[in-house]
């Protein structure tokens, strides 16, 4: 692998690693309520729940939004970037899920501007002084740095999935070996979702995870909880 490609791969792994300072560990995307309600109770139900999130819920939309933010960054189109971000924030169905994406997005953008600065990123980030959706921040940074979209989208999907599996290990009766099997089972689907998102436009956005959305409302008043969403 040429040094430039190796450096790009290392940058991507750093950005989407659990150690990047975005606070992903604090969010379960409604999984904590799904455990409380009995929807997620073992490896099979966790796999089914996560498959729906990936294919019919937020992850599919996130990948499309990240791809559109990446395209806007590659063409230095600040107006398009702002429009994508506004739409991404509006798509969050509850207060907690809005916090989940906006807090991580702002943290990611600030950390990346500080550690991996570049002129294009600095200029485009000025277009987003307020809340920033997480997929938009990732797409913006990758596009500003000239990174290819498909690997970024696939890596984002894997990071999203692994974070929710990590949440399941803390909230549900699912062990580490089972969690690893869940990731392995769903990883091939992530590659397909990333490829499709790279070729999609905003008209392809849509979700059908109503029980998860309603659960995120109920999580706001859940008596005992360890996650912010």
Swiss-Prot record:
Superkingdom field: Bacteria
One of the record's GO molecular function terms: nickel cation binding
Keyword tags: Chaperone, Cytoplasm, Nickel insertion
Transmembrane segments: none
InterPro entries referenced in this protein's UniProt entry, alphabetically: UreF (IPR002639), UreF_sf (IPR038277)
Family assignment from sequence similarity: Belongs to the UreF family.
Name this polypeptide is given: Urease accessory protein UreF
Source organism of the structure: Methylobacterium radiotolerans (strain ATCC 27329 / DSM 1819 / JCM 2831 / NBRC 15690 / NCIMB 10815 / 0-1)
């Amino acid at each position: 692998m040429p040094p430039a490609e190796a450096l790009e791969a290392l940058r991507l792994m750093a950005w989407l690693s659990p150690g990047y300072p975005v606070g992903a560990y604090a969010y379960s995307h409604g999984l904590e309520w799904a455990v409380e309600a009995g929807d997620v109770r073992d490896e099979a139900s966790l796999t089914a729940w996560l498959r729906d999130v990936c294919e019919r819920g937020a992850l599919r939309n996130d990948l499309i939004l990240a791809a559109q933010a990446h395209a806007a960054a590659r063409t230095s189109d600040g107006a398009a970037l702002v429009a994508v971000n506004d739409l991404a924030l509006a798509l969050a169905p509850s207060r907690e899920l809005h916090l989940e994406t906006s807090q991580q997005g702002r943290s990611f953008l600030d950390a990346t501007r500080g550690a991996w600065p570049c002129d294009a990123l600095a200029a485009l980030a000025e277009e987003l002084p307020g809340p920033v959706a997480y997929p938009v921040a990732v797409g913006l940074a990758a596009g500003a740095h000239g990174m290819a979209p498909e690997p970024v989208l696939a890596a984002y999907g894997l990071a999203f999935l692994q974070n929710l599996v990590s949440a399941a290990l803390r909230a549900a009766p699912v062990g580490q070996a089972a969690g690893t099997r869940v990731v392995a089972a769903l990883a091939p689907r992530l590659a397909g979702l990333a490829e499709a998102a790279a070729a999609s436009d905003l008209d392809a956005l849509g979700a059908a995870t109503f029980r998860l959305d309603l659960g995120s409302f109920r999580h706001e008043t859940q008596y005992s909880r360890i996650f912010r969403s």
